[in-house]
């Protein structure tokens, strides 16, 4: 029997009604109250997520920038201390190793935040391509991560932080902030389509911080949230999930994150030739939004057809709690990717009518 990994917060899940599942080898809460309630809390008030299963890798040294420029697609040279950047790592053929965040903590000090299911693979990939005076250290087990997301997230977090959180702009962060006396790195980032913060602290401090935030946020409607709501929220905001919208067989251009691929940067990064070609001449496939017109919910790997021709497949799909519609993301032949194109999805051996629609499905009002 495989032993599932647990985050430092595992022992407090039950107190808040957490129902756990096996998620990529981790025993994590899929929900606390209900996915719908948690989803709505984040869209209208605030939600608190345990994302300590995510991986953290430190890259340090004189050659850390040169090294990162070689292994990621975005231009890390534009990043200033106190800034965060979304990027991808690719194989030489343009397929995706992972998508990740890079935090620049110092001139020769970067923190990479990677997907839980890819920690070992990513670390080996990074370590095997190290150049010059750069070091790569996997610190995942030492670091916990909480995410507080939603329109009321700032007000709630401000109760336990003395620094003015308004000074932390989108994709910026402050390190060494005290959150209820606990040292943490606090960044205005997230995976929900809402405003909010991600808080990195030592593993041993996570449970205390979790309980404190839920206590001070109770009157504003802060709810403990699980993976179910995290997935429906990121899906509505059309944020890719590795293993679904991104994989070793799907390039960042196909997945719609071309903004994180800078083919004009000087460094010859892995996948550059393929990604440059796709940026300039178009990729063969495109990730599109689809709305099901008839009954049925599109799920991962369901085939998409026009007539008898299979043109692609669904990468993610759900009944959207916000839009009250059955929607999906699908990677399809670029010839059929225009909005309003009528397609069919095979749901349980039955063809169901659907239409290509614009994305993101949800965008918060500023």
Swiss-Prot record:
Alphabetical keyword list: Aminotransferase, Transferase
> Which Gene Ontology BP terms does the record give?
glycine decarboxylation via glycine cleavage system
| Catalytic reaction equation(s) | N(6)-[(R)-S(8)-aminomethyldihydrolipoyl]-L-lysyl-[protein] + (6S)-5,6,7,8-tetrahydrofolate = N(6)-[(R)-dihydrolipoyl]-L-lysyl-[protein] + (6R)-5,10-methylene-5,6,7,8-tetrahydrofolate + NH4(+)
Question: What InterPro entries does its record include?
Answer: GCS_T, GCS_T_bac, GCST_C, GCV_T_N, GcvT/YgfZ/DmdA, GcvT/YgfZ_C, TrmE/GcvT_dom1
Which residue stretches, if any, does this entry annotate as coiled coil?
A: none
Instruction: Give this protein's Gene Ontology molecular function annotations.
Output: aminomethyltransferase activity; transaminase activity
Q: Cite the EC number.
A: 2.1.2.10
Is Metal-binding included in the keywords of this UniProt record?
A: no
A cellular component term from Gene Ontology for this protein is: cytosol
| Quaternary data | The glycine cleavage system is composed of four proteins: P, T, L and H.
> What family does this chain come from, according to its entry?
Belongs to the GcvT family.
Q: What does this chain do?
A: The glycine cleavage system catalyzes the degradation of glycine.
Q: What is this protein called?
A: Aminomethyltransferase
In its UniProt entry, the species of origin is given as: Bacillus cereus (strain B4264)
Tell me the classification of the organism that encodes this protein.
Bacteria, Bacillati, Bacillota, Bacilli, Bacillales
């Amino acid at each position: 029997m495989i032993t599932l990994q647990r985050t430092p917060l595992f022992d407090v899940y039950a107190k808040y009604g957490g129902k756990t599942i096996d998620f990529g080898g981790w025993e994590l809460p899929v929900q606390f109250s209900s996915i719908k309630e948690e989803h709505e809390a984040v869209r209208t008030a605030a939600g608190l997520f345990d994302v300590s299963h995510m991986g953290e890798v430190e890259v340090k040294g004189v050659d850390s920038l040169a090294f990162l420029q070689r292994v990621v697609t975005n231009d890390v040279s534009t990043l200033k201390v106190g800034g965060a950047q979304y990027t991808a790592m690719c194989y030489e053929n343009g397929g995706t190793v992972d998508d990740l965040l890079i935090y620049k903590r110092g001139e020769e000090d970067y923190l990479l935040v990677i997907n839980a299911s890819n920690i070992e693979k990513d670390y080996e990939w990074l370590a095997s391509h190290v150049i010059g005076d750069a070091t790569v250290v996997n610190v995942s087990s030492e670091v916990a991560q909480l995410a507080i997301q939603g329109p009321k997230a700032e007000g709630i977090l401000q109760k336990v932080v003395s620094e003015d959180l308004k000074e932390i702009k989108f994709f910026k962060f402050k390190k060494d902030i005290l959150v209820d006396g606990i040292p943490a790195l606090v960044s205005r980032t997230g995976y929900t389509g809402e405003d909010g913060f991600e808080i990195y602290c030592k593993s041993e401090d996570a449970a205390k911080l979790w309980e404190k935030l839920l206590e001070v946020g109770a009157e504003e409607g802060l709810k403990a949230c699980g993976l179910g709501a995290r997935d429906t929220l990121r899906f509505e905001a059309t944020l890719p999930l590795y293993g679904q919208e991104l994989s070793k067989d799907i390039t960042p251009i196909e997945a719609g994150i071309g903004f994180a691929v800078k083919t004009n940067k000087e460094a010859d990064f892995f996948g550059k030739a393929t990604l440059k070609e796709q940026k300039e001449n178009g990729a063969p496939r495109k990730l599109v939004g689809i709305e099901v017109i008839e009954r049925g919910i599109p799920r991962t790997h369901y085939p998409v057809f026009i007539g008898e021709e299979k043109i692609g497949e669904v990468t993610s799909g759900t009944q959207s709690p916000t839009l009250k519609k059955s929607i999906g993301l699908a990677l399809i032949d670029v010839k059929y990717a225009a909005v309003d194109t009528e397609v069919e999805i095979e749901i349980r051996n039955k063809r169901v009518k659907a239409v290509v629609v614009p994305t993101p499905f949800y965008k918060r009002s500023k």
